[in-house]
Design a protein with these regions (language model features):
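Pocket-forming structural segment of enzyme catalytic cores
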Residues: 102-174
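Glycine-rich nucleotide phosphate-binding loop and flanking beta-alpha elements
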Residues: 58-59, 92-94, 147-149, 189-191
């Protein structure tokens, strides 16, 4: 069984990569593939159980978007066919239509997830999160510069109990599309939520 980490050289903030290394400790037979920015993602041509991409810097977002853009249609098709893809932190922003910022040029996203992300760099949001999914509670942390706008209020991953969602007003957090699960929660998501990890 294989798990692929996309771009660990830049998508490595907040200890997000420990989500995958935790799985390796739970299942020593798991083979971890680390795909760099200059390589085609292996899950597009090989059997990979889980694809993971974590948080990165604003420059890292641009690099990741540029690296994945040639494969956007193939990634969307794989997700729709059930390929398990987990995106945490600001990684989902790359998969949106675009990332707009008050202090940088707009980054064209992959258009796999709906809506646009708007960053206000001097208004960082930090909070705890409590939500529900499939009968279980999910806890986590958020630290972000912006929110997802112009996305329909459906297709979320978690329902909010406390904290904020895609926008401060939304009751949904994250996105689901086929086998793609995306959340703005950062850090050891799977370690903090064993039932979610088992799911």
């Amino acid at each position: 069984m294989k798990a692929e980490i996309l771009f660990p050289e830049v998508c490595n903030l907040y200890g997000d990569l420990q989500n995958i290394y935790y799985l390796k400790r739970c299942c020593p037979a798991l083979e971890i593939i680390e795909t760099d920015l200059h390589s085609k993602p292996r899950f597009l041509t090989e059997d990979v159980a889980l694809v993971y991409m974590g948080s990165t810097t604003e420059q890292g977002l641009r690099l990741a978007a540029d690296a994945l853009r040639p494969y956007a249609a193939d990634i969307a098709a794989k997700a729709d066919a059930g390929q398990l893809i987990l995106l945490t932190g600001n990684a989902p922003d790359v998969f949106s239509d675009a990332i707009e910022s008050d202090s940088a040029d707009t980054i064209e996203g992959l258009g796999i997830l709906p809506g646009r992300v708007r960053y206000t760099m001097m208004k960082r949001h930090n909070s705890f999160f409590l939500g529900t999914f499939d009968g279980m509670e999910v806890v986590g942390f958020k630290s972000l510069f912006g929110f997802h706008y112009d996305a329909p209020e459906r297709g979320g991953w978690f329902r909010i109990t406390r904290g904020v969602g895609r926008t401060p007003e939304s009751k949904l957090e994250g996105f689901c599309r086929g086998g793609l699960y995306a959340t703005a929660l950062i850090g050891p998501l799977l370690i903090l939520n064993p039932p979610l990890c088992k799911w």
